[in-house]
């Protein structure tokens, strides 16, 4: 299956066509750990462990089990080429990965087929998911800083959760430090990411994110920052949420 150079994908209120085009151009490089997606590959083990551990605490599973997510339905919104879908499928989850970029979905399907993983990939948006579908775990990882309406997007995510489910969101804080590190440093100095990958004014502070979630009857139960240590040349989970951060939310009791 060849990847097409352009594919507009579906249109919905939360989708920015410019953002789709931007990431569609990178579709063939998603699985290259040394390519333009290298930063995502480097933080991926931390994302996986954070989500896995949060899910195991919530659903009372043994995180050390190779099938710790067995029987749980997971929706990965903005899944790209499946960097999260594949490991969680291996842990037993029933994963649906959605992305508005047809080229990303094509890349995801090719890679999953090679690995013989039964992942349900769909070129669609969160607004187009059947409202009768419900998920134990909803992921919105590095997505909300690319949508046009954060509140509407999160509301739709919340509506797709099972009553006892969790939502995990990863994004970038909006302050001088995130501008210096995530844009100037990552895109212009270190060139870890293509220039224009992020727009600083679309970053979301933890307080803003929590306010949105509260509006949909949800509370934040866990949170963590992701920090790069240049001396050790590695990323780690941290209480420092000034730049990259993740939160776990669930319906308030």
From Swiss-Prot:
InterPro entries: SAM-dependent_MTases_sf, UbiG_MeTrfase. It catalyses: a 3-demethylubiquinol + S-adenosyl-L-methionine = a ubiquinol + S-adenosyl-L-homocysteine + H(+); a 3-(all-trans-polyprenyl)benzene-1,2-diol + S-adenosyl-L-methionine = a 2-methoxy-6-(all-trans-polyprenyl)phenol + S-adenosyl-L-homocysteine + H(+). SUPFAM superfamilies: S-adenosyl-L-methionine-dependent methyltransferases (SSF53335). One of its GO terms (biological process) is methylation. Keywords: Methyltransferase, S-adenosyl-L-methionine, Transferase, Ubiquinone biosynthesis. One of its GO terms (molecular function) is polyprenyldihydroxybenzoate methyltransferase activity. S-adenosyl-L-methionine binds at residues 47, 78, 99, 141. Its EC number is 2.1.1.222, 2.1.1.64. Pathway: Cofactor biosynthesis; ubiquinone biosynthesis. It holds the Pfam family Methyltransf_23. Belongs to the methyltransferase superfamily. UbiG/COQ3 family. O-methyltransferase that catalyzes the 2 O-methylation steps in the ubiquinone biosynthetic pathway. HAMAP family: UbiG (MF_00472). This is Ubiquinone biosynthesis O-methyltransferase. It comes from Rhodopseudomonas palustris (strain HaA2). The gene is ubiG.
């Amino acid at each position: 299956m060849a990847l097409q150079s352009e594919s507009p994908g579906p249109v919905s209120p939360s989708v920015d066509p410019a953002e789709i085009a931007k990431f569609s151009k990178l579709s063939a490089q998603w699985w290259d750990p040394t390519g333009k997606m290298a930063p995502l590959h480097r933080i991926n083990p931390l994302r996986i462990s954070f989500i896995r551990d949060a899910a195991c605490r919530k659903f009372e599973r043994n995180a050390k089990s190779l099938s710790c997510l067995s029987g749980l339905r997971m929706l990965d919104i903005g899944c790209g080429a499946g960097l999260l879908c594949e490991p969680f499928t291996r842990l037993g989850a029933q994963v649906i990965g959605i992305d508005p970029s047809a080229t990303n979905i094509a890349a995801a399907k090719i890679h999953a087929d090679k690995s013989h993983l039964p992942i349900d990939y769909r070129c669609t948006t969160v607004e187009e998911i059947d409202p009768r579908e419900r998920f134990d775990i909803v992921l919105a990882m590095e997505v909300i800083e690319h949508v046009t309406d954060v509140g509407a997007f999160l509301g739709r995510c919340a509506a797709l959760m099972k009553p006892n489910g969790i939502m995990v969101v990863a994004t970038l804080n909006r302050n001088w430090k995130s501008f210096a590190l995530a844009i100037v440093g990552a895109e212009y100095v270190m060139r870890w990411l293509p220039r224009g990958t992020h727009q600083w004014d679309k970053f979301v502070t933890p307080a803003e994110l929590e306010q949105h979630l509260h509006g949909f009857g949800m509370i934040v139960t866990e949170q963590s920052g992701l920090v790069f240590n240049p001396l050790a040349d590695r990323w780690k989970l941290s209480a420092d949420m000034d730049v990259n951060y993740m939160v776990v939310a669930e319906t308030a009791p």
